[in-house]
UniProtKB/Swiss-Prot annotation:
It comes from Methanocaldococcus jannaschii (strain ATCC 43067 / DSM 2661 / JAL-1 / JCM 10045 / NBRC 100440) (Methanococcus jannaschii). GO terms for cellular component: plasma membrane. Keywords: 4Fe-4S, Iron, Iron-sulfur, Metal-binding, Methanogenesis, Oxidoreductase, Repeat. [4Fe-4S] cluster 2 binds at C46, C79, C82, C85. Pathway: Cofactor metabolism; coenzyme M-coenzyme B heterodisulfide reduction; coenzyme B and coenzyme M from coenzyme M-coenzyme B heterodisulfide: step 1/1. Belongs to the HdrC family. Its EC number is 1.8.98.-. This is CoB--CoM heterodisulfide reductase iron-sulfur subunit C 2. It comes from the Archaea. GO terms for molecular function: 4 iron, 4 sulfur cluster binding; CoB--CoM heterodisulfide reductase activity; glycerol-3-phosphate dehydrogenase (quinone) activity; metal ion binding. Residues 26-56, 67-99 form the 4Fe-4S ferredoxin-type domain. The keyword Signal does not apply.
Amino acid sequence: MAVIKLDEVNKNFVNEVIEAGKLVLGEDIVKSIKACYQCGTCTGSCPSGRRTAYRTRKVLRKVLLGLDDVLDSDDIWYCTTCYTCYERCPRDVKITEIIKTLRNIAAQKGNMALAHRKTASYVLRFGHAVPANNQIVELRGKLGLPAKSPTAQFSEKDLEEVRTLIKELKFDKLIAFDWEKMDLKE
């Protein structure tokens, strides 16, 4: 077990997380982290935790202890946002919302999982996070659906609107997107 050195602790970290999350989620939601007493129900319920080293309780504990290195960790990106922990928590801690807040803070600092950046790049390239390939178009036809779904992927005008919005929000910079290559920067 690692030793926690007081000079490495950000005593304001939990309040910074609450402040960052309250704008979008409401203060009561993110402030619920303070009710966590580390029972482990979240970790025991987590489908990601069964297949990876992800431990929800550990993430919350790091926040409560002021260990802001959690923002540099892959752990916050392993959460599938299934809300199982959220629904089972005996203290009504809004765990999934706290994880999403941590992701937002991490992303603003330039720390984002490659898989999330790639998915975001599909939105910039195709107007859809999961673009339809030839197999999907063929399957849609067999099901009696129009070959092209009504998404920005198949509408140049809508795709340009999506791209304009992304540029205005500087989301392309956040994921390090190269417009010339139409792909992520290496």
